[in-house]
Every structure is written in structure tokens, then in C-alpha cells.
Amino acid sequence: CTVFDDGAHKPKYTGASMNECKVHMGHINLAVRFKIWLDDEPFANGIEILFVVFIVSTPFGSTAYFNQITRGVFYTGLGVAFKNTTELTSHVIVPESVVVRAQITRGPAVLAYDNTEKYLDLRQGDRLELRKSEIPATVLTWSRLSNPANGF
């Protein structure tokens, strides 16, 4: 996940996640508004979406928070889900080559990702780019990981 200030070309933050990146409302009493693009195509006809949580998940992470929101898992691509949105939008699974872009149109918000205590405060105008990492992850286990699609 890469975060840019409004209008900036140089990122103010870059982070990596194995499971998911999520944007959550920054204040308990204020939902967040944003616009989203899948590559350069506006999502949901470019409407401004009001939400409590917006998540982009990997297949590995789809069994966790993504599943809690959507009641589904996936084995390839990236999953985009919304929790407590006022819009009639569906969760979507996109090819792993797609870049998910979002811009906060009303904040504040918080960016968090799995297994870390760190988070990043976001404000109105901040832009996010979420994509599959070019660096593969190494998972150490006692036994082999598998799934029905052998995607892990």
C-alpha cells in the first residue's frame, strides 16, 4: 500500500501486508467517504462511498477479516470489501494485476494492516494505491499449506 498527500507525486508512506490493508474511520462518530478506481476505471460509476471499513485483501488473508465482512473466501486475485456502507455496492474480486486506487473525500481515517501495532492517520485528499507486491512472501510452517485451488 502506498499513500500520497493530495496532489503529491512522492509517497508519504509505503507498507506491505500479507493478509490485508484496511482503511477504518478515524473517529468513532464519523464515517469516511472516498472514491475508488480499479486501475483507472471508476468503481460503482465513480460515486462517493460512505463506509466504516474498506479492505483490500490477498487470498491468504481472505479467510480472516475479509471473510468476516463478506462471508466468503477466494483463491486468486485481490478482494475489495466494504463494511457498513450506505451505498448499494458489492464486494469484488479483481485480478492480481489490478491496482486499487482510493481517495479520501472526507476523513479522518486510519490505515492499518495485519500483524502490526503501527497505523497511519489519513486525512481528506490522501490517495492510496494498493497492489500485489512484486516481492514474494516466505511462509514457514510445520506442515504444508494448501487450499482447494492450490493457490497458496
Regions found by a protein language model. Give the residues of each.
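Catalytic phosphate-donor-binding core of small-molecule kinases
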Residues: C1-F54, F60-F152
